[in-house]
């Protein structure tokens, strides 16, 4: 089997995989792909077009012609900067909703694969190692306890790690975990050839170092 110059990092929402993947890519001089952003963009685009997330046919049609442009750290949708707009909890739930549809996943699959060049790629998502880049040189399943993930998200948006808003964040994370694990197409799970990395007690720096150490041994 010919291995691809890819590090595939999969895991649940708010596990820190995006931050880790971006830093690993920077350290190696590789490109970085947040596959989840494409599903978030699809959910947001559907919302803007008045298409319900449960409408597989029309959502997949939008996914095929998704007018998205990745420019540095910014993401444009139909010319509008939506870099922050796609990161809301509501759009995260929308991404999980549209990701359950086979036609939507098929529409976005080749677009994700097109990000790979000779330069090398670090990709994060929920099925990057199992579906998008099954021949990746290194596959990692990165996770953390749900409460830890909720605390990290709360700190990220500047709210206390207690109270109603925090409990809502925790509930949203657990709800999305359940949906991702139980969807019929490409459910979220650790693949047999993926290394497990629990970051509950690790800093970002420690996690990045662990990934780089593993990659150098491939």
From Swiss-Prot:
Gene Ontology biological-process entries: nucleobase-containing small molecule interconversion; pyrimidine nucleotide metabolic process
Compartments, as annotated in UniProt: Cytoplasm
Keyword tags: ATP-binding, Cytoplasm, Kinase, Nucleotide-binding, Transferase
Primary residence: cytoplasm
Coiled-coil segments: none
Entry similarity comment: Belongs to the cytidylate kinase family. Type 1 subfamily.
Name this polypeptide is given: Cytidylate kinase
Native source organism of the sequence: Neisseria gonorrhoeae (strain ATCC 700825 / FA 1090)
